[in-house]
Amino acid sequence: MSPIEIPVKIQLVEKRETRTSRGMLSKGWYHVDDQLVMVKGNSITEAGTAGYEPYSEVMASLIAQVLDLPHVEYTLMPAKLFPDIQTYSCDVVSVCPKFTTDDEQLYHFADLADAHFLASGQASSPEALFQYAVELYGKKWLYQMLAFDAFIGNEDRHENNFDIIVRNGKNYAPPIYDNGGSLLAWATDEELTDTKLRYQFDKAKPFRSRHAQQIKLIDEPVLPVCDLDELYQEIIQTISPILALLSEKRAYAIRQYLKYRLHYLKATMG
């Protein structure tokens, strides 16, 4: 059974373009089979290297499911059914439901942090930013997100890439979403086949530039202890339908990448 879903009804609601570090990312709100969803394409560099964001989004959501973390579910749909969404050498788009209700507002962490530092007169720094995030989200949710990002090698958790849900004047942490820059989505074929290059994919945001440093901010366990070999096998089995859509070279690299990064999960178990 193919993991690519075929919807019956599609209606464009609002087209959007987002500027990323890799250029413009095409996305839009749609009614798909009477559900309001966000549809996203993939990116391309000036050098013409296309990203694999839709595949990474879906695999990351499946991994979050295995880890029992709050997350938004993503699916793949054929790109040709969404002609308003630009894709580059990619036959699929990622699709996820709107996860807020009409009486909820979503605020970027970046905007809240700017307002906080402006009101307090405190200078912004990576340390101050991290402490504010701990106050805002609490350790458990924040640490789980950082551990998850480290495991999947998410390069793009910038300050506009996680939010706060406000409902009736109260703050709530959102489910984890927007993981397109993970799981070697931006690795070239050359980087996939070179083991040393592949394992260098450890860029992090927003508190440190490398996951090896950012994971050290976690000072208490946030994941249950489990057998890492069994966990790895369950994860690979769960994402295997998506891996089957990729070249064997890329699928193998992702499997090895995740095995290598298990130590990040182990560091947060207890």
Regions found by a protein language model. Name each.
Residues 58-66, 140, 144-148, 256-263:
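A broad, structural surface signal
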Residues 95-146, 237, 264-265:
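ATP-dependent phospho-/nucleotidyl transfer catalytic cores
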Residues 124-188:
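Conserved kinase catalytic-core segment
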Residues 57-61, 113-118, 193-196:
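Short, low-complexity, polar/charged sequence segments that are solvent-exposed and flexible
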Residues 1-112:
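Conserved ATP-binding subdomain of kinase catalytic cores across diverse folds
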Residues 64-65, 119-123, 198-203:
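Glycine-rich loops and low-complexity Gly/Arg-rich segments
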Residues 68-73, 126-129, 204-210:
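Short C-terminal domain-edge/linker segments immediately following a structured domain
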Residues 169-270:
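C-terminal catalytic region of ATP-dependent kinase domains
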